[in-house]
Regions:
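Non-catalytic signal-transmission and effector/linker regions of two-component phosphorelay proteins
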Residues: 1-7, 22, 117-125
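Conserved acidic segment of CheY-like receiver
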Residues: 6-15
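Two-component/phosphorelay signaling modules centered on CheY-like receiver
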Residues: 15-33
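Acidic, metal-coordinating helix/loop segments flanking the phosphotransfer/catalytic sites
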Residues: 36-51
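Conserved phosphotransfer microenvironments
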Residues: 54-70
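His-Asp phosphorelay/catalytic-motif detector in bacterial-type signaling
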Residues: 75-80
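Alpha4 helix (beta4-alpha4-beta5 surface) of REC/receiver domains from two-component response regulators
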Residues: 88-103
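Output/docking surface of receiver
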Residues: 100-112
Length: 125
């Protein structure tokens, strides 16, 4: 896998999860970049990261619109999109899946499995 693909883009505003993702990415041998602006994400996604992680509740970043744009463009084929949300948000989960999110998880499950998810995307396992 080319070096440029061993990158994580994370679209979130939560400091706790920013640190958690950065730590897990480091342990998986991946670089991580935090993005808060939709336009900035589309530019950075052109570098074809392995995975883009979305806090589906970060409304300022327009996660559903971004997911649909990314999945609708052949330029981003092969980039995995993962979203997390509260376990009680069934409608948002369905909307994210319909927009093209590859994996939608409850925040607790995402947190618990983050290390394994990133290792898988880094090519370690």
């Amino acid at each position: 896998m080319p070096q440029q693909h061993k990158k994580v883009l994370a679209v979130l505003s939560d400091l706790f999860f920013s640190v958690k993702i950065a730590d897990a990415a480091k342990r998986a041998g991946m670089a991580v970049e935090l993005v808060k602006d939709p336009h900035e994400l589309m530019i950075k996604a052109k570098a074809k990261p392995s995975v883009i992680i979305f806090d589906l509740n970060f409304e300022d970043a327009q996660p559903l619109e971004l997911i649909a744009k990314l999945k609708g463009s052949p330029e981003f084929k092969g980039v995995s999109l993962i979203g997390y949300l509260s376990h009680v948000q069934g409608e948002l989960k369905q909307a994210a899946q319909e927009a093209g999110c590859d994996m939608v998880m409850a925040k607790s499950a995402f947190s618990q499995n983050l290390q394994q998810i990133l290792k898988r995307h880094s090519g370690v396992i």
